[in-house]
Regions:
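Carbohydrate transferase catalytic cores enriched for Leloir-type hexosyltransferases
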Residues: 1-332
Length: 332
């Protein structure tokens, strides 16, 4: 369904961009670009909803400069049921277009590189040269140390942290089920489970459930619109973090957790195992019992948790965003 038109032997035109953005500005209305043949145009991946790719293709044909792109993941194509109807086709067209114009694609994980290469082969497009760059995980130093009263109250007690937009793919629901299971079994001395993130799409029923379920009313807290200072305090103060995502192109909250020296219970899917290997504890994202048992274990067994924290401190190497930028610039 996503197969693209065959490459024109004469290279006279690029396949038409088939997206909802096609009614946007026409190429003739763009500001005149001073691009030379020796230049490299780098797009960081925020062009998927703009009508610029065909324009870039024609400009590249005319001038001969290089185009490098960044690919984060192809999750809407792989798992269309996580998104609105038509998102899979929209993104398949975007990646197809990217393949026609790119000389090089930077992927944020080996998982993304393999997923994208497989997709492009299936689409019948060119497969540009690809390389993997590691994303930064060091949050900037926070000068303003003002914290909200709600966050300060949360940080006073023992808690487990999950940082992510609240959406189906991030799988907050499995943690809710794990907590209910433990509470029903009589394990009432559990740390508070703190969700940090804005509600996304298709989670209204879930948000209603955790608000109305009296079993978790004092055990699950949702924080949103937190400041950088608040987020830093939460990372620093939590017992450990959890991240049961169903699929990732990288998994930045996992890396940020490790950068703060915090252990993470995480799912074993997508790119996540690339982040830190055996420093993490992996659980099937659908395994309610597995999540419940391991949350209970690391919440109660301070010695096991301390061993993990020591390993992270000794072995995890953080990556600055400057290092990420430098690794890209060196390959341009």
């Amino acid at each position: 369904a996503y197969a693209w038109r065959e490459w024109n032997a004469a290279h006279n035109s690029m396949p038409h961009v088939q997206s909802g953005a096609s009614a946007a500005r026409t190429p003739s209305s763009y500001p005149k670009a001073d691009i030379r043949k020796t230049d490299t145009y780098l797009t960081m991946g925020l062009d998927w909803d703009h009508n610029k790719i065909e324009f870039l293709y024609r400009l590249k044909k005319q001038i001969g400069f290089r185009i490098n792109c960044v690919a984060y993941d192809i999750i809407p194509v792989l798992f269309p049921h996580f998104y609105s109807e038509g998102a899979d086709q929209f993104f398949a067209h975007y990646f197809s277009n990217m393949a026609w114009i790119a000389d090089h694609i930077f992927c944020i994980s080996e998982c993304t590189r393999k997923d994208l290469k497989k997709l492009l082969v299936e689409l019948g497009t060119p497969v540009p040269e690809m390389s993997v760059v590691r994303l930064g995980d060091v949050l900037p130093e926070i000068r303003d140390q003002h914290h909200s009263e709600q966050v300060k109250q949360v940080a006073k007690e023992r808690f487990i942290l999950m940082v992510s937009t609240i959406e189906i793919r991030k799988n907050h629901h499995i943690l809710y089920k794990a907590y209910v299971r433990l509470l029903e079994q009589g394990y009432t001395d559990l740390p508070t489970l703190v969700f940090v993130g804005m509600p996304g799409w298709r989670v209204d029923d879930f948000m209603f459930t955790i608000r109305q379920d009296k079993r978790v009313s004092n055990k699950i807290v949702v924080l949103n619109r937190v400041t950088d200072a608040d987020l830093a305090l939460l990372y620093q103060s939590c017992a450990f973090t959890v991240y049961p995502s169903l699929y990732e192109g990288w998994g930045l909250p996992v890396a940020e957790s490790l950068a703060y020296g915090k252990f993470c219970l995480t799912s074993n899917t997508g790119s996540i195992p690339e982040i830190a290997g055996d420093l993490l504890h992996y659980i099937d994202p659908w395994d309610v019992v597995g999540w419940a048992e391991n949350i209970k274990k690391y919440a109660a067994d301070t010695q096991a948790l301390e061993h993990k924290l020591q390993e992270i401190g000794q072995r995890y190497k953080t990556t600055s965003w400057h290092e990420t930028a430098s690794s890209i610039l060196k390959q341009l």
